[in-house]
Amino acid sequence: MTAHLIDGKAIAASLRQQIAQRVVERRQQGLRTPGLAVILVGTDPASQVYVSHKRKDCEEVGFISQAFDLPSETTQQALTELIDRLNDDPAVDGILLQLPLPAHLDASLLLERIRPDKDVDGFHPYNIGRLAQRIPLLRPCTPKGIMTLLESTGQDLYGMNAVIVGASNIVGRPMAMELLLAGCTVTVCHRFTKDLAGHVGRADLVVVAAGKPGLVKGEWVKEGAIVIDVGINRQEDGKLVGDVVYETALPRAGWITPVPGGVGPMTRACLLENTLYAAEELHK
């Protein structure tokens, strides 16, 4: 048996097309074009690439994108004042603060400074709390994108044993809440977990977001399981690989996401989806 590929690239393209169509409809109705402000501090190469992709996505769907490229020495106060200004700008529906930030800046305080109804990354404690209380508003982009990928498989998640490998605030923890909402029995594994292979082997659904190439071996995967690989790691030869050993997982899994072309495109598409939602539902 060879796994069905979950093509995040194609699903994300379809989602962007739907968003672009809705933007056209809004203009025809005389409604405001959604606006996204993207803040980049410093010159981290990976962050620059991510931000350029997000800006291109905005252009593709017809959003108004505001770019704020700030020097590495930008102060906490200056960044706070910029966020306050964008919070008060009625043309801005979403504010994205690209992480990681330079070491002298307090990311937690800055993310909390973003108004919850403009927190299109879904990182604000208010939005995480809404998700925990089963009344999600703006949902964290990567877990939200993964839920869309899972829906595309047509599989019923109710009652599934789901294992998440990685307990970060950005993916692992909110992913656990999303899967609880979907009716899964959820186990979260982390660096202190004993017998990781055993946990993975009992899972009907595995979401791996540990940032460690090849951490999950293909032979651990239960026959027919759904495997979602969030990891994206560049090897010395320049090749991008995930946290799952793809070649050996492929013949065992029922469904699997490739790296690249799986989760990454969906994270970006869900940022656009959240921005449109903010414009339509929260900033009428």
Swiss-Prot record:
Signal peptide extent: none
Ligand binding (NADP(+)): G166, A167, S168, I232
One of the protein's GO biological processes: purine nucleotide biosynthetic process
Keywords: Amino-acid biosynthesis, Histidine biosynthesis, Hydrolase, Methionine biosynthesis, Multifunctional enzyme, NADP, One-carbon metabolism, Oxidoreductase, Purine biosynthesis
InterPro entries: Aminoacid_DH-like_N_sf (IPR046346), NAD(P)-bd_dom_sf (IPR036291), THF_DH/CycHdrlase (IPR000672), THF_DH/CycHdrlase_cat_dom (IPR020630), THF_DH/CycHdrlase_NAD-bd_dom (IPR020631)
Keyword Transcription regulation set for record: no
E.C. code: 1.5.1.5, 3.5.4.9
GO CC terms: cytosol
GO molecular function: methenyltetrahydrofolate cyclohydrolase activity; methylenetetrahydrofolate dehydrogenase (NADP+) activity
Pathway field: One-carbon metabolism; tetrahydrofolate interconversion
Catalytic activity annotation: (6R)-5,10-methylene-5,6,7,8-tetrahydrofolate + NADP(+) = (6R)-5,10-methenyltetrahydrofolate + NADPH; (6R)-5,10-methenyltetrahydrofolate + H2O = (6R)-10-formyltetrahydrofolate + H(+)
Transmembrane keyword on record: no
Domain of life: Bacteria
Family: Belongs to the tetrahydrofolate dehydrogenase/cyclohydrolase family.
Subunit structure as annotated in this protein's UniProt entry: Homodimer.
Role description: Catalyzes the oxidation of 5,10-methylenetetrahydrofolate to 5,10-methenyltetrahydrofolate and then the hydrolysis of 5,10-methenyltetrahydrofolate to 10-formyltetrahydrofolate.
Protein name, entry field: Bifunctional protein FolD 2
Source organism of this protein record: Pseudomonas putida (strain ATCC 47054 / DSM 6125 / CFBP 8728 / NCIMB 11950 / KT2440)
Gene: folD2
